[in-house]
Regions:
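Non-catalytic interaction/Regulatory regions outside core domains
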Residues: 1-150
C-alpha cells in the first residue's frame, strides 16, 4: 500500500494534472504536495481548500438522508451505494468529493476515509483544456482507498 508521496505522484500522472496535495482540513496544513500550486504557495492553497472542505463536511445540508438514493438514512449512508454503484461504508464521510470549476481549471477535493478519526482530503488541480474530470474523480477515489496514513 502506497504512502503519501507515491499517491500524489500517481495523481500527477492524470491528464492535465497541474498540482496535487494531501490536506488536513481541521488544521489547513498540507501533509504532502506535488506539482504546482494555483497561487504559487502550497500552504496557502491548503488553507484555502481546507475551508471549503470543512464547510462541506460539517454542514448538515450535505449529510445523507432517507431521501438519498439507496434510502439508507443517517450520516455516512450505511448500507447504501455510492455514485459508482459500490456499497458505501458505515461511518464514512457524508461527502465523497467536491468539484470547483474555474475558467482555467478544475479543483477536485476527495475525502479520504481511514480506520482512525482523520480529517484529510486529496486536492487535485487540473487544467481545464487537457484534464479529464470524470477520469480524475475515478482515479482519486482509487488513490484515496489505497492511501496509507499513520
Amino acid at each position: 500500500m502506497p504512502g503519501i508521496d507515491e499517491c500524489l505522484t500517481e495523481a500527477m500522472t492524470l491528464p492535465g494534472a497541474r498540482g496535487a496535495s494531501l490536506v488536513d482540513w481541521t488544521s489547513g496544513l498540507a501533509l504532502g504536495t506535488a506539482g504546482e500550486s494555483p497561487v504559487g504557495d502550497h500552504e496557502t492553497t491548503a488553507a484555502e481548500t481546507a475551508e471549503l472542505a470543512r464547510s462541506a463536511a460539517e454542514f448538515d445540508t450535505f449529510l445523507a438522508t432517507d431521501d438519498d438514493a439507496g434510502g439508507t438514512g443517517g450520516a455516512g449512508g450505511a448500507g447504501g451505494t455510492g455514485d459508482d454503484g459500490r456499497p458505501e461504508k458505515a461511518g464514512g464521510p457524508p461527502v465523497e468529493d467536491l468539484i470547483v470549476t474555474t475558467r482555467a481549471g478544475y479543483h477536485v477535493l476527495r475525502f479520504v476515509e481511514t480506520s482512525f478519526d482523520s480529517s484529510v482530503f486529496l486536492h487535485l488541480w487540473l487544467d481545464r483544456e487537457t484534464g479529464n474530470l470524470a477520469l480524475a474523480r475515478m482515479r482519486l477515489r482509487d488513490i484515496a482507498e489505497k492511501l496509507v496514513l499513520g
